[in-house]
């Protein structure tokens, strides 16, 4: 066998070994998971990255060293695997981190604190500025106080509430509020408070329950201390800020989380639109003129929206795929051209969205159009890839059934098992929101936060935004590719730092610009591919 053939066979063997482990749902590996030669080849080819000595995560040869995607995608699996290997069952995440995870907050932290009776009180640096600190502790959860979630050992919600430091209530009020509101059995909290007695913590939690409209739970805590222990509980408010209504008692954490995000953010959107001097919502008087503007802005919108996602788009390509005689079935060039297929899918989806906009400006409800339409728009986006055999039709019939990760972001979208409920909650929030500006801005943000599909979420979120803007008589608003960094940074601030201000200002300013520059949008010329890559 020639040397080149031997190398090719060795590469295939290494990749086959990696695929076998991947098919088991694994992203994190130990030295012994591979034959030494396979491991060396995978590292050299860029398919593995070493995190710590003897610990590896799956990567991609296309990733730059600064790219955080592979690390963030593997982070929680690494934490579970590393500490299970090091301490067995003798470890638990901090009460604060436990509470965050119970509240469906999967954001990758800068540092994670782990307790174990066998810990060495050391900090270990991890990739991209993250770290772990293992804290030796004699106090470990009993079987009743522990919970295991995706291999991560946590304090139960009740015990985490009792053990978090008081400053956590103000620093992470949304996480605390979600867990308080989702608690069904208050007896678990009372049990953790009275054995041993913690009257100060009881006062903190009783007031916290009152802040989220759980008077029954607060009274149960106070009365239990009085009846069972003869102790008086003095309530103290640790939130230090108003707590918004989240939803029904016992509702799922993801629904409560989205409701809380919406309520905390809506006034900031209203303020941003006022500051940008965007006029109040109004009915569209000249519907034909409005729709002509939508038609004329299509090429500009398609170029920018697709370029943001990393496709190589030109004015000529957009024009070519928009013609009735464009044929992906019999043209081998079209079959192999992902940019052309994406551009055609965008044209098909835009056509559907345009009809939804037409119905909205004719008096229809933008929330109803979004609820019934967003899955169809997604299907149209990827139908050309189904047509040429690059995707199976069954992958487009529902929300994602796997976890997704965002390139360069610390935000980890909700797990696949809660996506349906999250999207139903989002649609309800939009339907009940009276302000069209709030519908559009928060609808876009939370659509991307949930990330309901395996791909195309950014395009779908921008479509959703424009349908919702139409409900207020606002013009179709293009997010420009030259603003990509500010756009994504503002979304990151909203999702990770809970700061909606940058994103609200960004969208308000773009809407103001669209109002000032209607009815005609300038067309772009031939443009080359941006220097970034496509992300889900």
Predicted regions located by residue number:
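FIC/Doc superfamily catalytic core
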Residues: 1-33, 43-53, 59, 63-536
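Non-catalytic DNA-binding core/recognition domains of DNA-processing enzymes
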Residues: 38-41
